[in-house]
């Protein structure tokens, strides 16, 4: 059994999702297309030709899904607000019907005793803004801040915990450099400019959120990976340093007041469109930092590739998930301690952590996923070890509440604690979901014991 006794008494136990991955209803109640609607409907971009048109049909099943959150024992739910549902024009007036949906969701969560954690951007940029340059232009940063203000003005009396962006690395590097995610570009200059305007949009949104809600608690969510060299050669050591810059430092340093890493500015060779005051805006003080963790990266030099000229290599004999990602819980502990010791972060949430496996529904209707149970236990134990060494970890959000549209992988990759039969929309709590609820109960029992003592 995992030793989780080091987790604080007020530890937040959550589950997480994202709008495009679960909502469906892409053309209902005034929602406009997002870049992911465009991307997923482009032949060859998503495995199986899958789209988010229906997904988990969460838009029509909110009460049922809130019930599942409670069944899993979670006391917090991290969801994202769909920008094209709330401001279909990208900028300008609010679509009342779109914002009403999140109003009902928040009220339902609070009635069920679940704390809402809202993410304002989880990759679904309105296509109308992409048509005008998307994140490669400064105006999108400004429109994002205006949209953030509109959402917080409506929900901020009940939602106190806000994330500006989810995994901006994926939006910039995978969406604009590697082309494997929307908008599907392969342009280093566009990618670097997008990274900058995502950061600027974050900083402007922090200002907008605080102006709209004086007691808001604001953070950002970054996906990070420990980086290790494949060998002790000078080339691999240098490649690991560049990969760390590309994956970690580029996304942490500016928002935490250190500016952009000069070695990576030189590596990319792209002029950043910095205006006076921008770096201060980007480094607006935060109340918490969100960490999404899935795997470490072991890299070797790749001089013929694109920036950062480092290529990930496989680990012989490693345990792998259905994503072919190595299971390495120690990496989560390493990152939590790095954020604490190197960056001085004062409050951290693990905002995503989870695994995909080839789940099978048994004859009796149950779904047994022992690999995911083990994964959960190992990563929560890593969290507890980090807390024991001083990490200010305030909570953990399992990815994901339920199986959903896994971006370019379509519906083949299942991350949920709850199984979804996409043909019928039937939800079934997996063994991992039952175990998660058990871990929450055990922690609550320890908390009551500490209080009684």
Task: Locate each region found by the language model.
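Active-site mouth loops of central-metabolism enzymes
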Residues: 47-61, 138
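Catalytic domains of carbohydrate-active enzymes, especially glycoside hydrolases
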Residues: 61-82, 284, 288
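A common structural microfeature
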Residues: 10-12, 59, 76
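Glycine-rich, proline-tolerant flexible connector loops at the mouths of alpha/beta enzymes
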Residues: 81-94
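Active-site region of glycoside hydrolase catalytic domains
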Residues: 2-46, 70, 89-91, 99-453
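Internal amphipathic alpha-helical repeat/solenoid segments
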Residues: 58-65, 88, 98
């Amino acid at each position: 059994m995992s030793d989780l006794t080091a987790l604080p008494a007020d530890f937040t136990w959550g589950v997480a999702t994202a709008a495009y991955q679960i909502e469906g209803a892409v053309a209902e109640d005034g929602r406009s297309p997002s870049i992911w609607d465009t991307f997923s409907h482009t032949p060859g971009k998503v495995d199986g030709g899958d789209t988010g048109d229906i997904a988990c049909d969460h838009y029509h099943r909110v009460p049922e899904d809130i019930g599942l959150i409670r069944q899993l024992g979670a006391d917090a739910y991290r969801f994202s607000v769909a920008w094209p549902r709330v401001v279909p024009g990208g900028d300008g007036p609010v679509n009342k019907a779109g914002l009403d949906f999140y109003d009902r969701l928040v009220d339902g969560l609070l009635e069920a005793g679940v704390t809402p954690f809202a993410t304002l951007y989880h990759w679904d940029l309105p296509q109308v803004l992409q048509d005008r340059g998307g994140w490669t232009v400064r105006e999108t940063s400004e429109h994002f801040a205006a949209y953030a203000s509109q959402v917080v003005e409506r929900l901020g009396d009940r939602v106190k915990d806000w994330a500006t962006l989810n995994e901006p690395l994926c939006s910039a590097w995978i969406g604009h450099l590697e082309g494997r995610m929307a908008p599907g570009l392969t342009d280093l200059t566009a990618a670097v400019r997008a990274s900058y305007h995502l950061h600027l949009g974050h900083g402007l949104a922090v200002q907008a959120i605080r102006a709209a809600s004086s007691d808001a608690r604001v953070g950002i969510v970054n996906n990070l990976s420990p980086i290790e060299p494949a060998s002790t050669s000078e080339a691999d050591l240098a490649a690991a340093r560049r990969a760390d810059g590309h994956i970690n430092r580029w996304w942490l340093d500016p928002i935490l007041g250190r500016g952009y890493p000069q070695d990576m500015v030189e590596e990319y060779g792209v002029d950043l469109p910095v205006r006076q005051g921008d770096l201060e805006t980007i480094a607006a003080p935060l109340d918490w930092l969100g960490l999404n963790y899935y795997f470490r990266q072991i890299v070797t030099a790749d001089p013929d590739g694109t920036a950062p000229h480092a290529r990930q290599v496989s680990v012989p004999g490693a345990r792998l998930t259905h994503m072919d990602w190595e299971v390495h819980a120690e990496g989560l502990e390493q990152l939590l301690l790095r954020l604490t010791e190197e960056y001085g972060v004062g409050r951290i949430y693990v905002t995503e952590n989870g695994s995909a496996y080839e789940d099978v529904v048994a004859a009796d209707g149950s779904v047994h996923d022992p690999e995911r149970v083990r994964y959960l236990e190992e990563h929560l134990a890593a969290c507890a070890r980090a807390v024991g060494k001083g990490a200010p970890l305030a909570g953990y959000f399992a990815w994901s509440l339920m199986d959903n549209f896994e971006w370019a992988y379509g519906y083949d990759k299942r991350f949920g604690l709850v199984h979804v039969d996409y043909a019928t929309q039937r939800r079934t709590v997996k063994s991992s979901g039952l175990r998660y609820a058990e871990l929450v109960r055990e922690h609550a029992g320890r908390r009551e014991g500490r209080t009684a003592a």
